[in-house]
């Protein structure tokens, strides 16, 4: 989902937004995958009625969005070879982090976990940034058979660990 608007409150990868959807009382917290001046990129998984409604929004739909929520990742701590580890919906905010770390000349490795090969997303985008990508799938249909923690065993020389996603 791409949103046009004021992105000045977003200061670090890993922050999130809260979307107010018409017909729903509760806002939907969605992590920011990437942002630039005037545009937000959000990637979400349909898990309920709210995110289902988001898939049906027409281009140009006006939304009430609270931006710049959460602390985000501290880019100054990554060292020369940061390791990014995430699973499922924890992967999108790591993309924005990888983009900024590679722009700083860091050697980024991303270990990305999925339930099965058919659910893999953003892996090629990480590679396009110059990041090394290790895939782990719970069912063994792609990459390393297991969880992201199993994929971490393939990387031993990292200088800092960034994580986002569900507990293994």
What are these regions (language model features)?
Residues 1-61:
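Ferredoxin-reductase
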Residues 49-168:
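FNR/FR-type flavoprotein reductase catalytic core
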């Amino acid at each position: 989902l791409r949103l046009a608007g004021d992105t000045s409150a977003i200061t670090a990868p890993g922050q999130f937004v809260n979307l107010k959807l018409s017909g729903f009382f509760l806002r939907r917290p969605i992590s920011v995958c990437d942002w630039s001046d005037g545009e937000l990129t959000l990637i979400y998984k349909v898990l309920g009625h709210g995110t289902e409604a988001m898939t049906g929004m027409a281009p140009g739909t006006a939304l009430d969005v609270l931006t710049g929520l959460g602390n985000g990742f501290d880019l100054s701590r990554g060292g020369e070879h940061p390791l990014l580890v995430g699973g499922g919906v924890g992967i999108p905010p790591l993309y924005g982090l990888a983009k900024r770390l590679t722009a700083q000349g860091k050697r980024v490795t991303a270990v990305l976990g999925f339930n099965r090969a058919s659910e893999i997303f953003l892996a090629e985008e990480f590679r396009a940034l110059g990041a090394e990508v290790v895939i782990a799938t719970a069912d063994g249909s792609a990459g390393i058979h297991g969880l992201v923690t199993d994929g971490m065993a393939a990387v031993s020389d990292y200088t800092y660990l960034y994580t986002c996603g569900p507990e293994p």
